[in-house]
Amino acid sequence: MVDKSCLCNCNIFLIVLFISLCLLFGIVKCDEFLTESTVEFSNSGSLTEILSSEQYVQKFVCNDNGLIQLRLYMATFSRKNRSHLYVSLKDENYDEIKSWDIDASLLKDNAYHTFALDRRIRDSKDKTYFLCIKSDAETGQGVTVYYNDDENDLGLSLNGEKLDKQLCYQLVYKKTLHNSMGGGLKLQFLMSALLMIALFAVVYFGRDWSIEKKFLTIWTMLGLMYLLTLPLFRAPDEIAHFMRAYEVSQLDLLSELEESSGIGGSMLPLEGVDFFALKSWLSFWGNHKTIVLSENQVFKHFTNTAVYAPVSYLPQAFGMIILRAFTKNIAVISYGGRVMNWFAITILMYFAIKVIPFGKEILAMIALVPMNVHESVTLAPDGLVVALSMLMLALVLHFRYARQDILKPWEVCSLYITAWAIGMLKIVYLPFGLLYCLIPKERFGGIKKKRRHIFAMAFVAVASNLLWLSLCTDFLRIEATDASAQLSYSLHHLGTFMVVMARTFFSDLDIWATRMIGIDLAELNIRTVGFLIFAYLFMLVFRYIENDRHSSDKTDRVVNGICVLILVSIVLLIAASLYLQFTPVYNNTIVGIQGRYFIALLLPLYFAINKPSRLMVDREQNDISMREFGLIVCSNVCACIALFFSCM
C-alpha cells in the first residue's frame, strides 16, 4: 500500500510542476510579445575591413521606448581574424552608455551580432544616439559591417567625414506589460490568470468529486478561458462561418449563387466591414465599437460554408438573433453566436457523460483535448459534431447496458433527431447511425419494431442528406478542381485511388494526430507546447490499451465490429469527399484533411479495441487521476497563453 502522506506530497508536487510549466511558458510568450525589433535593412554591400586607424559612427533616432539591444550585420571575409572590435553606444551628448570589446575571431560570417545593454533605456523614443565602431586590426585581420545606401544622408561617418550610407543594423525594444495593454486587455489578462489558478485548485481540491462534476467544472472554466484568449475570426474559416450563421439568423436557410461569379453567398448587411480589424486583440479594442452592421446589404461570398445545412448553425444563429435585438455591433453579435454554440455543446457533452454507463473518463479526456475546446468556442460547427457523436454513442451504451425497459416515445424520437442531425451537420459522419443497431430489440418492443425504426431512421437521415446535397451542389466549386472528372478517374482507377489515400495517410498521419490534440491552434498557425501535446496523446494511447487484456464474448465482438465499421466508413468518406471536392484532378495526395475531423472518431475507436462487458464490470474503478487532470489543464492553459500573446 502506498502511504497516503507520500501520495499527497506527490500530488502537490505534480500540481506545482504543472503550474510552474504554465508560468514559465507564460513568461516566455510574454517576453516574445514585449520584445520588438526594427526591420532589417537590405544590404547594398560591405564596408572595407575596419582597421585601427578608422572609426565609424552611425547616428540613429529611436522610434520607441525601451531600447535593450542593437544588432549589426557583420562579415569576417570567411576567415579567423586576430583582432578586437570596440563598439560603444553614446547618447545625444556623446556620453558613453555602454561599450563592448569583441574578439573578432569569434564572430560569425554574414550574420547579425547582438550588442546587449545592461538595462533597457526607458525613455529612448525620439532620442538621438551614436554607435561608434573601432578596431585594433592590421590589414588582413579586420572584420566589416554591411551597409545600405538606398537614401541620402543616412547618418554614417568615417573619421568625421559623412558617408551617404547607413549600417545594416536593427534596434530591439523591450516594452512593459503595463504600457502595452489597455484596460480591456488588462482585464482579460487578469481574468485568464484567475481562471488558471481556479482550474488547478479544482484539480487538487476536487479530486474526490464525481467525474461528471469535475468535467463540467473544468470544461466551463476552459471554455471561458478560450473565449478570453482567442480573438474573433481566428479559427479556420470563421469569417465564412459567421456569414453563413448570420444568413441563417435571417431565416435564409439556403444560400444564393451569384450569377456573375458563380460563387455561393448571400446578401448581408456587411458593406465595408473590416473583419480583419477584429482578428488581433490590440486592433480589436481599438476598433470594435466602430465595426457595425451596415444599412445597405451587399453580396458576400462564402461558398465553402454555403454547403452547410442550417442545423449546423442553429445555436450560433439563435445567439445572434438575441444580441442583434440590442446592438448592431458585429463583435458583440459574433460573441453571442460563439457563446450560444459553446453552451449548446456544453449541454450535449454533459448529457453524454451523464448517461454513458462506462468510459466516462475516456469521454472526458477526448472532450477536453485543446483542439476540441478551442473549436467549441468558435462559430464553426466542428465542436457540435463531436458533442453530438458522443451523445449518440452514450445513449446507445446506456440503452444497451443500463436500461431494462422499453424506450419511451420521446427517447425513440431523440434517436431519430440525433441520427438525422449528425448527417446534416456533416454528411461524412452519417455512419454514426449504425450505432443504433446495437440497441437490443427488447428496448423497441421486439425485433420487428426495431427493424422498422432502424430502417425509418436510416431513410430519414439518408434522404435528408441527399435532398440537401441536391440543393447545394452548385456551391461545391473549388478552384482548380473538377469533381466529375475526379470521380470518373477514381472509378476507372480504383487501385490508384487507394494508393493515393495510403500515400496521404503515410505522409500526414503524424500531423493529423498532433493537430487533432491541438499542437497548432487558431488558423493552424499558432504553435502550442509540443511535448505537452505528445504527453496528452500518449496518455490517451495508454488509456486505450490498458483495459485490452480480457477475453471477450460474442456481444463484445458485435460492439467492436460495429465501431470498426463506423471508423472505416467515416475515414473512407472523409478521404473520398475531399479527394473529389478539394483535390486537383490526378493529384497524388488528398488535399484538405484536417486532424480535427478525427476527434469524433476517438470514442468509437476506444470501444472498437476494448471489451464493453469488462468495462461495465470495472466502471467504478475507472476515474481520471489528478496527474491526468493536471496534464489536461496544463495543456489547455498553455494553449490559451499561446493564443493570447500570439494574437496581439
Feature locations, PLM:
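Beta-sheet-rich sandwich/jelly-roll-like modules and their strand-loop junctions
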Residues: 7, 17-93, 107-112, 116-128, ...
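Membrane-lumen/periplasm interface segments of multi-pass, membrane-embedded glycan/lipid transferases
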Residues: 178-185, 291-300, 465-550
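Transmembrane-helix motifs of polytopic, lipid-linked glycan transferases
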Residues: 199-202, 335-358
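Transmembrane-helix signature of polytopic, membrane-embedded enzymes
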Residues: 210-213, 328-331, 350-370
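Interfacial juxtamembrane loops and adjacent helix segments
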Residues: 252-336
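Membrane-interface alpha helices of multi-pass inner-membrane proteins
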Residues: 374, 410-427, 432-438
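Short acidic/glycine- and proline-prone juxtamembrane loop motifs at membrane-interface regions
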Residues: 378-385
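Perimembrane helix-loop-helix junctions
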Residues: 395-406, 430-462
